[in-house]
Amino acid sequence: RYTLRLLTLQQFQRATALICAMEVLRRAEPEVWGDAPFTIGLWVGQRVTPNTTDESHAAIEKERDGKYGTGSTSAQLTRCPWCGSEIAPGRELKVDRDLGRTFVYCGDKYGRCEFSQAKSKNLGLPVLVVDDEIYRHPPSMLIATVDKFAMMAWRGQVRALFGKANRECPRHGLLWPEADCNGNHTKKGSLEAVKVKEITPIRPPDLIIQDEFHLISGPLGT
C-alpha cells in the first residue's frame, strides 16, 4: 500500500503542472475556455490527506507552530509546479472556514507567479486535497487510490463525484442530503448573501483509468 500511495502522490505532483498550464490558458481567454477553473484533486487515505476542512485547518496550525507530525496534511506540494518556488505549509497554505476551502499558494516572494497570493488570491494553485472539498467542488482531474472508490457503498457524498447532486450552494459548492450547509446564507464580511439552488445532475467522469493494477492484492484486488 505504501508503494501505491507514494506512486499516487508523485503522479499528482507531475499532473498538477499540466493543470496549471491549462488554467493559465483559461484565465487568458475566459471567453473561449469558460469561467470555471481547471482543477486537480488528490483523493487518498486519511493518513495522507485530511477528510474535512476542520482537519485541514488543525494540521496547518500545527505546522505553523513547527509541530510536524505523522498525520494527514494538506501540504502535498513542496514547490510550485508552475515556477518552482518553495511552498511553506505555515505560510502558503490558508483555510477559509466560511467557504470551507483550503487554498495552496505559490511561495514566490515577488508575487510574479500566476498562482501567488498577489496574482491569484481567490484560488491559488488549482489543487484540492481535502476529501469534503473534493466532493463539493469536483475537480477536472482526480488522482486517487482504489480503496477510496470502494467507499461509495457507504459514503453518500462520494456520489457527487459521479454527478449525483441536485443542489448547489454558491458559497460551498455541491450539496448532498447529509451536507453541513444549512441552505441560504446572509452577507458576511466580503461574502455576498447567497441562496441554495436546485441543479440538474452534473456530468460524471468521462474517463476512469486504473493504473498499476498488478500492485493491488488481497480482497480489494479481487
Write out the residue ranges for each language-model feature.
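Short helix/loop capping segments that flank catalytic or ligand/cofactor-binding pockets
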Residues: T8-Q10, N51-T52, S116, M151-W154, ...
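Cys/His-rich short segments
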Residues: P50-D131, F162-K197
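Conserved motor-coupling elements within RecA-like helicase/translocase cores
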Residues: E133-P138
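SF2 helicase catalytic motif II
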Residues: P139, D147, L161-G183, E198-T222
